[in-house]
């Protein structure tokens, strides 16, 4: 939780200049440490639906040991679902109409599978835009993950994602580009993030839209950016929520499809498998190519995987939650407390 500058100690102002959150006594008096209501618009396909829930719930739940979080999952009815997923959604998810009536403090929008080059041609496009429009006016901050970032950049800023010659896939090194922004305050200035995407929105596109880049990679491009107001829309292109095994499961899926001829044999995700893991996987691929029926060597590979991103992901989500707490209204459903400028809610210079 943030410091309160309850006297004129110069250290408070120095910490502010260094990007550390320090509240004035006036702002602190207007803060109420209440439960936070966080929506999760889960657009992921059936196979990843529940895993995505767990990943984002874990990040939010671990972000602050004091706050209490009420998570509100929902989805879009236009997304194709099988019987099992529909049953899960029917039992455990909420309707957007009910969420809209009750209000949210923060919203996370996941990625989704697509079948069209132009996102506006997807069946989920108009329902997604309805959620995005509502959130802009009624939610303190919306965090967009991967494809959701591309959708918002296209819809709100007329910046269309660009298909890349090869998939941006693996674990990539990133650097913080503005250490003073509260979203990246006190996180490692160099850290890893997994990526898994064919399309990209470039730094030039973000900047043309007035969106500030906060974290980027020389190889994978921009990971973290924020709308020009500093908080109301947060953009991820990477997948910091991924479990240690997430990229392995993607590789397994694609490699098994390759054995049937449905896909070309996939490359290894960058900077993810060590040499021993690569040897296990290469041997499996070689032997299945010549017709052997083998069990995928998951049990041998999993112990060899390292997670080099989760602690920083927790820190960034913790900063985001902290920023929301500072400015959200005491009344659920109103985005900002009195006196907060929606065009500069964090009071950034």
Curated annotation (Swiss-Prot):
<feature type="binding site">
    <location>
        <position position="167"/>
    </location>
    <ligand>
        <name>substrate</name>
    </ligand>
</feature>
<feature type="active site">
    <location>
        <position position="241"/>
    </location>
</feature>
<dbReference type="GO" id="GO:0009086">
    <property type="term" value="P:methionine biosynthetic process"/>
</dbReference>
<comment type="similarity">
    <text>Belongs to the MetA family.</text>
</comment>
<comment type="function">
    <text>Transfers a succinyl group from succinyl-CoA to L-homoserine, forming succinyl-L-homoserine. In vitro, can also use glutaryl-CoA as acyl donor.</text>
</comment>
<dbReference type="Pfam" id="PF04204">
    <property type="entry name" value="HTS"/>
</dbReference>
<feature type="binding site">
    <location>
        <position position="196"/>
    </location>
    <ligand>
        <name>substrate</name>
    </ligand>
</feature>
<feature type="active site" description="Proton acceptor">
    <location>
        <position position="239"/>
    </location>
</feature>
<keyword id="KW-0963">Cytoplasm</keyword>
<keyword id="KW-0028">Amino-acid biosynthesis</keyword>
<feature type="active site" description="Acyl-thioester intermediate">
    <location>
        <position position="146"/>
    </location>
</feature>
<feature type="site" description="Important for acyl-CoA specificity">
    <location>
        <position position="147"/>
    </location>
</feature>
<dbReference type="GO" id="GO:0008899">
    <property type="term" value="F:homoserine O-succinyltransferase activity"/>
</dbReference>
<feature type="site" description="Important for substrate specificity">
    <location>
        <position position="196"/>
    </location>
</feature>
<keyword id="KW-0012">Acyltransferase</keyword>
<dbReference type="InterPro" id="IPR033752">
    <property type="entry name" value="MetA_family"/>
</dbReference>
<protein>
    <recommendedName>
        <fullName>Homoserine O-succinyltransferase</fullName>
        <ecNumber>2.3.1.46</ecNumber>
    </recommendedName>
</protein>
<feature type="site" description="Important for acyl-CoA specificity">
    <location>
        <position position="113"/>
    </location>
</feature>
<feature type="binding site">
    <location>
        <position position="253"/>
    </location>
    <ligand>
        <name>substrate</name>
    </ligand>
</feature>
<dbReference type="GO" id="GO:0005737">
    <property type="term" value="C:cytoplasm"/>
</dbReference>
<dbReference type="GO" id="GO:0004414">
    <property type="term" value="F:homoserine O-acetyltransferase activity"/>
</dbReference>
<keyword id="KW-0808">Transferase</keyword>
<keyword id="KW-0486">Methionine biosynthesis</keyword>
<comment type="pathway">
    <text>Amino-acid biosynthesis; L-methionine biosynthesis via de novo pathway; O-succinyl-L-homoserine from L-homoserine: step 1/1.</text>
</comment>
<dbReference type="InterPro" id="IPR029062">
    <property type="entry name" value="Class_I_gatase-like"/>
</dbReference>
């Amino acid at each position: 939780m943030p410091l309160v500058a309850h006297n004129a100690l110069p250290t408070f102002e120095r910490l502010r200049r260094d990007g550390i959150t320090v509240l004035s006594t006036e702002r602190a008096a207007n803060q109420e440490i209440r439960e936070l209501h966080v929506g999760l618009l889960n657009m992921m396909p059936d196979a990843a639906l529940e895993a995505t829930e767990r990943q984002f719930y874990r990040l939010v739940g671990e972000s602050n040991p004091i706050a209490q979080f009420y998570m509100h999952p929902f989805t879009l009815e236009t997304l194709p679902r099988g019987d099992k997923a529909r049953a899960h959604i029917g039992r455990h998810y909420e309707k957007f109409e009910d969420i809209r009536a009750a209000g949210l403090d923060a919203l996370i929008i996941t990625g989704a599978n697509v079948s069209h080059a132009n996102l506006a041609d997807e069946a989920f496009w108009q329902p997604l835009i309805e959620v995005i429009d509502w959130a802009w006016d009624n939610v303190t901050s919306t965090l967009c993950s991967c494809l959701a970032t591309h959708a918002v950049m296209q819809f709100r800023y007329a910046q269309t994602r660009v298909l890349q010659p090869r998939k941006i896939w693996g674990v990539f090194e990133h650097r913080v580009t503005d250490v003073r922004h509260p979203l990246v305050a006190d996180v490692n200035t160099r850290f890893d993030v997994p990526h898994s995407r064919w399309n990209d929105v470039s730094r030039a596109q973000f900047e043309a839209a007035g969106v500030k880049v906060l974290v980027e990679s020389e190889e994978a491009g921009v990971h973290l950016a924020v709308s020009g107001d500093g908080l109301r829309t947060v953009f991820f292109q990477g997948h910091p929520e991924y479990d240690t095994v997430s990229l392995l499961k993607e590789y397994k899926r694609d490699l098994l499809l390759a054995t049937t001829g449905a896909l070309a044999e996939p490359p290894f995700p960058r900077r993810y498998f060590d040499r021993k893991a690569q040897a296990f996987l290469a041997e499996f691929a070689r032997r299945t190519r010549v017709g052997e029926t083998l069990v995928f060597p998951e049990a041998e590979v999993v112990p060899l995987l390292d997670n080099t991103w989760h602690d920083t992901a927790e820190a960034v989500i913790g900063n985001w939650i902290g920023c929301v707490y500072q400015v959200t209204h005491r009344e659920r459903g109103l985005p900002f407390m009195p006196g907060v400028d929606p065009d500069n809610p964090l009071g950034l210079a």
